[in-house]
Design a protein with these regions (language model features):
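Short, Asp-centered acidic motifs that coordinate Mg2+ and/or phosphate
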Residues: 32, 62, 142
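Predominantly a Rossmann-like dinucleotide-binding segment in NAD(P)-dependent oxidoreductases
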Residues: 122-196
Length: 228
């Protein structure tokens, strides 16, 4: 019996990837799709549209929360309380305080949940972990990583996805949205990085950042992160 998946929020650049995975995996099936903005739901899945999030949750064995960041905590809590495992886009909330509160609610529900941080699943990262464990690189003197995304240039953040450029809804700009992948990747290598300073590159309107850099420490060596 395939696992039924409901999409809570469709105005996200990764929607096509999610639909592709569901369509290609015989053990998965799409159960329902919901978004507060009906224009965000593509015509290809129009037959799966439901009028409210609760109905989508009830139809599913598990849910993917890819709504705007300001909606994610509430949707995650509703799904978790209903006993539906949750895969949620990152960041899981707009602020650290909201994220901690969400984590507490998820823990109380005892429902499995995880953010969509995919770098830690890359085979290359697992190989690097083995290289570091074996000491093949010798003594580390510094670490750096960068993450680039063309979304601001190719129109990925337009239309139903324009919320990603609104700090009030997204919570973070490009640095926070992308560098979180790098922070998680370093954590997956064995030690959580400690960030000490951040510099943001602002857009012309000055509303949010289009990238930036962060300095810190990882495994007692200097760490530099860059994302845009």
């Amino acid at each position: 019996m395939p696992i039924s998946i409901s999409l809570l929020g469709c105005g996200h650049p990764h929607l096509s990837d999610l639909l592709g995975v569901i369509a290609s995996e015989p053990d998965l099936r799409l159960a329902a799709a919901w978004d507060a903005d009906r224009s965000a739901i593509p015509g290809a899945i129009a037959n799966y549209v439901v009028s409210d999030a609760e109905r989508a949750i009830r139809r599913a064995d598990a849910v993917v929360v890819s709504a705007a960041t300001d909606q994610r905590p509430e949707l995650c809590v509703r799904a978790a309380r209903a006993g539906r495992p949750v895969l949620v886009e990152k960041p899981i909330a707009r602020t650290a305080a909201e994220a901690r509160a969400l984590a507490r609610e998820i823990a109380r529900s005892r429902t499995p949940a995880m953010p969509a941080l995919f770098l830690r699943e890359l085979p290359a990262l697992h190989r690097l972990q083995g290289v570091l464990r074996a000491g093949l690189l010798g003594r580390l003197s510094a670490a750096s990583a960068s993450y680039l995304h063309a979304g601001a240039l190719d129109g990925s953040f337009s239309g139903p996805r324009s919320w990603m450029q609104d700090p009030a809804r997204a919570g973070v700009g490009a640095l926070g949205d992308l560098a979180i992948h790098l922070v998680d990747a370093f954590a997956a290598l064995g030690d959580a990085p400690r960030l000490l300073a951040v510099s943001l590159d602002r857009d012309a309107a000055g509303r949010g950042d289009v990238g930036g850099s962060a300095l810190g420490r990882w495994r007692d060596v200097p760490l530099t992160l860059r994302a845009s």
